[in-house]
Amino acid sequence: MLLPVFLAAAVVFGVLSTLETKQNALLAWNLSVMLASTNLLAFPMVCALPLKRIAARLAKSGSAVAGFSGADAIRRSNCVILTDGDLFPPGTVTLGGLKVFGEESGKVISYAATMAHASESGLSRLFDNLLASDGGFREQVEDVDFYEEGGVGGRIHGKTVLFGTAGFMRKRGVNLPRNLGLKTGVFLSVDGTLIAVFAVKYMPAENVDWALHALHHSRITPVLAVRDGNITPALLKRKFGTDARAVYPKLSTRLALSERGGGRPYALLMREGLMPYAEVVLGSKRLCASAKRCTVLAFLAATASTLLAFYLTFVGAYSVLTPFSLLIYVLLWSLSALVDALLSDRY
């Protein structure tokens, strides 16, 4: 937008310098000096070079952004919505043990897999794999309800089945074994009677650890749109050493955020986990910030160069304005924007 203004100013200044020197033969020379000073090399690369650098980094992490417009839309938000799979991708949630109380293990696994699948949480894949290895099948569940305390309930064959954390079970009046040392256990009850305890282990992934610390450092707030009652800011603090100042909204908000979709896509994630997601968010902010700084630097360089060239041509100091000196001057002014653009992918 500013480039046509500078070009028009260069033409006007070139004409004024020619009129002042009263040498019409120098009009073309004055115009060439003014135009060369105004059309700096930094203008074409203020957006293109940072975008190229950021896009190359995102490609290595398995993600891509929809150009500068997509990055601009992403950087406007200072929060990211994280689901179960973002924080604990497949393979990081494992079963450490199983204890059954008065029921067949096949029935227990079938009921647990059914409730985990109904909750659509990160536990569903774990229990689906457990069910497949046991050779069982999921039951039909009705009247599925989610509870703020960290669990889900439903009816299977007319019986009330609850599936969730220890705190959830106590809130629902289910008696649990004494001296229970499980911090991330999952419990299953039928008609108010505990029938199984699953020791679930959450292993921190290195890429998620890096992503959470990067989000914390960049002051981007994670919003936990999780369905697994065990995944809380306290769990993140234990596993990753930081909760990144995560927001843990009410259940209704978490469910709505986890189901939200269908909007205009601004980025593409080709790998699971939080790292490519965080790379897109951080990269978009870096891209927009670098493009803004480079634009300001190019604007200042063009302004200073135009005014200086106008002064030198106006006073007739043509011995200073050699092609070589003008080229060096333009390159030096463009260097600051070039360095900023080249460092845009360092974060």
Q: What are these language model-derived features?
A:
Residues 71-97:
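Asp-based phosphoryl-transfer active-site loop
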Residues 1, 99-149:
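ATP-binding catalytic core of ATPases
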Residues 156-159, 191-330:
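Conserved ATP-binding TGD loop and adjacent catalytic N/P-domain core of P-type ATPases
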Residues 96-108, 173-174, 205-214:
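A short, polar/charged loop-to-alpha-helix boundary motif
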Residues 74-77, 148, 180-182:
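Short, small/polar residue-rich loop motifs at catalytic or cofactor-binding pockets
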Residues 81, 152-155, 184-190, 224-226:
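Cytosolic beta-strand hydrophobic patch enriched in CBS
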Residues 90-97, 164-168, 198-202:
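Short beta->alpha transition motifs characteristic of CBS
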Residues 1-79, 227, 267-347:
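Hydrophobic alpha-helical transmembrane segments
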